[in-house]
A protein has these predicted regions:
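Glycine-rich phosphate/nucleotide-binding loop
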Residues: 26-120
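Glycine-rich phosphate/diphosphate-binding loop of Rossmann-like nucleotide-binding domains
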Residues: 1-40
Length: 120
């Protein structure tokens, strides 16, 4: 598992750095529980080809940090999983696109992948 930092380059000019204070501490806690996790990594480089081969899962801190590169790389095959909720939340990796409503032109791959994921 690769985890992105909160700040774009995992650094800050301030004395308090959220990536060091919170994200790194959370990663250390997961490592103590024997979870194979590394980070925090800059969100602008975690999805480079050499890094994609290292991780089966990337956890980002917010929407655009992960969904923009995932949609660029995998187009309609990706799904969105939200963690930290009291229930499982999985969705297709695209918005509703109301301009296509009723035209039977939507690509349904992401929806099918989300349903298949839930059928584990």
């Amino acid at each position: 598992i690769g985890i992105t930092g909160l700040n774009p380059h995992c650094e800050s000019v301030l004395k308090i750095n959220e990536d060091e204070k919170y994200v790194s501490e959370a990663i250390k806690s997961l490592i103590k529980k024997k979870i194979n996790v590394k980070g925090p990594f800059p969100a602008d480089t975690i999805f480079l080809k050499k890094n994609r081969k290292k991780y089966n899962l990337v956890i980002g801190m917010y929407h655009d940090q992960v969904l923009t590169p995932i949609k660029t790389l995998f187009e309609y095959d990706a799904i969105n999983i939200t963690i930290g909720l009291p229930f499982i939340r999985v969705s297709p990796d695209h918005g509703p696109n109301e301009s296509m409503l009723g035209k039977n032109k939507s690509n349904h791959s992401s929806l099918l992948n989300a349903i298949k994921f839930l059928d584990f």
